[in-house]
Amino acid sequence: MKFSELWLREWVNPAIDSDALANQITMAGLEVDGVEPVAGSFNGVVVGEVVECAQHPNADKLRVTKVNVGGERLLDIVCGAPNCRQGLKVAVATIGAILPGDFKIKAAKLRGEPSEGMLCSFSELGISDDHSGIIELPADAPLGTDIREYLKLDDNTIEISVTPNRADCLGIIGVARDVAVLNKAPLQEPEMAPVTATISDTLLITVEAVDACPRYLGRVVKGINVNAPTPLWMKEKLRRCGIRSIDAVVDVTNYVLLELGQPMHAFDKDRIDGGIVVRMAKEGETVVLLDGSEATLNADTLVIADHHKALGIAGIFGGEHSGVNGETQNVLLECAYFNPLSITGRARRHGLHTDASHRYERGVDPALQYKTIERATRLLLDICGGDAGPIIDVSNEATLPKRATITLRRSKLDRLIGHHIADEQVSDILRRLGCEVTEGQDEWKAVAPTWRFDMEIEEDLVEEVARVYGYNNIPDEPIQAGLIMGTHREADLSLKRVKTMLNDKGYQEVITYSFVDPKVQQLIHPGAEALLLPNPISVEMSAMRLSLWSGLLATVVYNQNRQQNRVRIFETGLRFVPDTQANLGIRQDLMLAGVICGNRYDEHWNLAKETVDFYDLKGDLEAVLDLTGKLGDIQFKAEMNPALHPGQSAAIYLKDERIGFIGVVHPELERKLDLNGRTLVFELEWNKLADRIVPQAREISRFPANRRDIAVVVAENVPAADILSECKKVGVNQVVGVNLFDVYRGKGVAEGYKSLAISLILQDTNRTLEEEEIAATVAKCVEALKERFQASLRD
């Protein structure tokens, strides 16, 4: 939003300079992007009149003029501008004048004719880039008046960034309101008295889309002179706001747009067939716009139409057929309130961005239309003449926005600002903002003004009070809070400790999306029900994950595709499982999962290449589980998981409760996911492990330990873990260590059986064990194994 500082000061004129004004606007939340003078630095340029204008005797493109600047004599000035003519009021740089670029005017001869000055164009005075001709001033411009004073060139253009919530500041009136509030200054609105209708002409207006267009005002103005020149003061204001003058009718609608922030449109009334209809477009309907382009419309686009065709896209762009041209005599002025949702996105769909769409998308004051159409009518009649009919009002109060009533509590205000503002100041600020305020016990009820449709909740009022009070007036206060010592349970095992261990073992932590591809998830968890997102980022991210494996395996594939074949990664995060017993029907479990693949070690000249296997991952996992103090209660049991190899996987149990899985990815899944080589995964429900068993200190025996090795033959389907567990149970007082150190199948062992070599470490804390005691304990272990598993000692 760009505007003239002097135009703003016509509405409100605080006793501060330009820099202070710009800083104040910025601190109020409307960031000033730039302040620039409207003209270059010059002096000695005055208003003059061309009294005589004759052809230069020695040059075809030059003219010899006599110019009256209000002095004792006429000045002889040679001019080359094509629009120079007798009777024209012009800007004259007299001898001694200094123009932008330090260009000094001196008496000279041009092709033999004396020249005592220069007739200036806008570009020569640094006002604009227009160098097509000299400046043409109004006929009533007083001779000899300094041009800076006459055109009010001691002015600045101020450009601000208007945030989407402050659409009310997309007009001079909105910025002026804020400046008036900040300075406690009166707002001086220009006179906008209603225009008395001098004709009774109207036009039938029908609003079919009442939700999209709650209010539509129209007014017929007949007998205008569309070719009447736009006054220089209006052209200058438009120029300083970055708007090029086109013709009087368009200039008037642009002027009120900039002044009040309300878009308008003018139709050639004689080219409207039957009347105006505000409706939704028909699918595939076309309209030729004012720029000559053809737009093909969708059924959700609001259009202004007559009884046979669309005349334009509502709130965005008018149509060529009903546009005002040089032959127009009768116009229909349109001023409407369109629901922002009916305009949003439609302009971009057709590659358009107009001042009107910019404002309508953000919202305009629903109570501003009457004031705007009266203002535009008066300006149009003053410039183009003609007669105005009555205002045609088609409004639907039920669909117009309602003013919000908001309660502001003293406790909320003080808590969010961190500073106490006196009650009377709060009330005064709210009233200056345009709110209707009712004061209560430690609270205020405020009805937001129609132009502040961004005021909806209590926090909005807190923001407004702080903004107007001045952020710089809120003192810095150190935060005061009691120091509360956090409780620490020795039994709590932090994930940070687990992550550190995995890092030490060469794993890298990754974070993957909770949104996964439902097709991939079905491959990993066939038949499992997942939560599907109603509005996903993409189809490939439309399901909530049932485990962390989806993201981890995708990460492995990503790395393998980039020649990273040795991968060790882990992740902690939530899985989302549909569960009717859980809150909102979703159970969220904190999981710890990891993946390894590739070589066991980094490439080294002294190490043979060995691919990781089940026991590499199991060993790493046991190290993690050992941190919990529950490793002794952990069992790995053969159990089917559709994502894992049936012969190289296991379920992980904590006592009798399953808490996870470990194993090699199923070859079929490996193929479908494009994994390169054997890949191993694990996953644990971390919440079931986080409460660790605190280690108990115990005496270290001073007596020697004894090792005895036994080899027992058992059926192939007997888990080695059960054998070890049974040995520990039998020798609970004296067996301090049990370890499986060899598994043998082959000669001497019947098919379907295996030989397990087990070491038993026996030790007592009070005495040295006798050989008889050791032998008896070993015999008890062998007997227990024989009884439970039909084990036999291998010869």
Swiss-Prot record:
The keyword Transferase does not apply. Its cofactor is Mg(2+). SMART domains: B3_4, B5, FDX-ACB. Residues 39-148 form the tRNA-binding domain. Pfam families: B3_4, B5, FDX-ACB, tRNA_bind, tRNA_synthFbeta. It is found in: Cytoplasm. Keywords: Aminoacyl-tRNA synthetase, ATP-binding, Cytoplasm, Ligase, Magnesium, Metal-binding, Nucleotide-binding, Protein biosynthesis, RNA-binding, tRNA-binding. Its main location: cytoplasm. The keyword Aminoacyl-tRNA synthetase applies. It catalyses: tRNA(Phe) + L-phenylalanine + ATP = L-phenylalanyl-tRNA(Phe) + AMP + diphosphate + H(+). One of its GO terms (biological process) is phenylalanyl-tRNA aminoacylation. Its EC number is 6.1.1.20. Residues 701-794 form the FDX-ACB domain. Residues 401-476 form the B5 domain. Binds 2 magnesium ions per tetramer. One of its GO terms (molecular function) is phenylalanine-tRNA ligase activity. Mg(2+) binds at residues 454, 460, 463-464. It comes from the Bacteria. PANTHER family: PHENYLALANINE--TRNA LIGASE BETA SUBUNIT, PHENYLALANYL-TRNA SYNTHETASE BETA CHAIN AND LEUCINE-RICH REPEAT-CONTAINING PROTEIN 47. Tetramer of two alpha and two beta subunits. Belongs to the phenylalanyl-tRNA synthetase beta subunit family. Type 1 subfamily. This is Phenylalanine--tRNA ligase beta subunit.
